[in-house]
Amino acid sequence: MSYPLEEVNKRRTFAIISHPDAGKTTITEKVLLYGNAIQTAGSVKGKGSAAHAKSDWMEMEKQRGISITTSVMQFPYNNCLVNLLDTPGHEDFSEDTYRTLTAVDSCLMVIDSAKGVEERTIKLMEVTRLRDTPIITFMNKLDRDIRDPMELLDEVENVLKIRCAPITWPIGCGKLFKGVYHLAKDETYLYQSGQGSTIQAVRVVKGLNNPELDVAVGDDLAQQLRDELELVQGASNEFEQDAFIKGELTPVFFGTALGNFGVDHFLDGLTQWAPKPQSRQADTRTVESAEEKFSGFVFKIQANMDPKHRDRVAFMRVVSGKYEKGMKLKHVRIGKDVVISDALTFMAGDRAHAEEAYAGDIIGLHNHGTIQIGDTFTQGETLKFTGIPNFAPELFRRIRLKDPLKQKQLLKGLVQLSEEGAVQVFRPLLNNDLIVGAVGVLQFDVVVSRLKTEYNVEAIYENVNVATARWVECADGKKFEEFKRKNEQNLALDGGDNLTYIAPTMVNLNLAQERYPDVVFYKTREH
């Protein structure tokens, strides 16, 4: 059965992870520019700019009132078809960001070379560890003054616990940035700043000891490069494909996305080394990407911000087979067959109505409240894909009604929103409070506005004394009953009626874990 195999093998599905302001938006734009998906890249200077960099065509297409193209972008590069899944930045950081990482086969980690490894990057890397996702690293902003490159590699290795294999090495930085040397190819690529959509032709100098190099970058920088490379080649790791695929080693590239330099280097690495669509574990068996029959899982639901449209879009990662317009699929959780005739597909040429999609691709299903995160769709087989987690929230608020008579609608709304992954809801066992948990502040605002428009419920938040939450289980029924009896004031049920320990402080949580070694406290839970 060969028909989809060449299509499947061509695909590379990845996401970009970074701390806010490391340059992810610019890189996303430049990746599309190099992939010829957009003709102009309007980069953004300064926070006040209203042209907050959304590549031109992303804004164009508001199909049925929902702008979804920003979430998935597909473009051809080096005989591959690359799917880039956007992970929202700081304005709309949420659990969606974490879950998107469960739908990709590799990640590009972008680091601001002036700052090094930052907090959000650490969190996102923890999530990629759940599936040992292969990571490519791009040290960005070489056109500014940066930290010592060796120091940056050490920090990645020590903080993120992943070995670094430098592929390119910088020559100078800031105003003195002259380019990068490619260790494996023994070539120097000289930097000429390209801005916006101008990609400069790169001049290549072959050989580290070529006198042309000294002329091009100056004697001092050429000598500094040779000295540094002697150190680097002695102290750092060589690239190994196996270790990369296992998530143990990351190839490192240096460049400046703003200056259109170095982006093509990591894209070459991505298309050459990153895995094609991978197999996926389900509850009954492993599903291979080369299988003929269609299967896929929902990893994200995008709510519609336009009150005129009550529609939402469920994002599905195709795991195997081929999606064709009008095909009948089994919605496994509810046991119903559905005909999918209007799925949104994200193709390079026509992003609205492409007729087919293969393993590795992402399609959007119109969802009128029946689809939940983690749902599996198949061509008839009853199976459920695993590994689409709920994450313990980090921010909590108590939610209160302005009109106490609408308690029922409030609960219904919150449970539905939690099924959709917009927020998590906890109901303490000992009182009638409703506690809402999120990983990003914006999630709280979204919930209040959607409760109002979709459920006609006006709600407000109050502070609540909760630091963190963990799902709890215990194999020993007797010990679990004792734990529940003695900790009732800290226990709650989540939206799916799973028992949760609500801790007022981290110290409290640590003490509870010490006191009850037989009880397992989970930071993530399967959808």
Swiss-Prot record:
A Pfam family it matches: GTP_EFTU
Sorted UniProt keywords: Cytoplasm, GTP-binding, Nucleotide-binding, Protein biosynthesis
Name the GO terms of the biological process aspect: regulation of translational termination
Domain tr-type G, residue spans: 9-278
Q: Which GO terms describe its cellular component?
A: cytosol
Which residues hold GTP?
Answer: 18-25, 86-90, 140-143
Where does the protein end up?
Cytoplasm
Q: Which domain of life is it from?
A: Bacteria
Q: What is its main location?
A: cytoplasm
Q: Which InterPro entries match?
A: EF-G-like_DII, EFG_III/V, G_TR_CS, P-loop_NTPase, PrfC, RF3_C, RF3_dom_3_sf, RF3_GTP-bd
GO MF terms here are: GTP binding; GTPase activity; guanosine tetraphosphate binding; translation release factor activity, codon nonspecific; translation release factor activity, codon specific
Q: Which residues cross the membrane?
A: none
The family note in this entry says: Belongs to the TRAFAC class translation factor GTPase superfamily. Classic translation factor GTPase family. PrfC subfamily.
Its annotated function is as follows: Increases the formation of ribosomal termination complexes and stimulates activities of RF-1 and RF-2. It binds guanine nucleotides and has strong preference for UGA stop codons. It may interact directly with the ribosome. The stimulation of RF-1 and RF-2 is significantly reduced by GTP and GDP, but not by GMP.
Q: Which PANTHER family match?
A: PEPTIDE CHAIN RELEASE FACTOR RF3 (PTHR43556:SF2)
> What protein name is recorded for this chain?
Peptide chain release factor 3
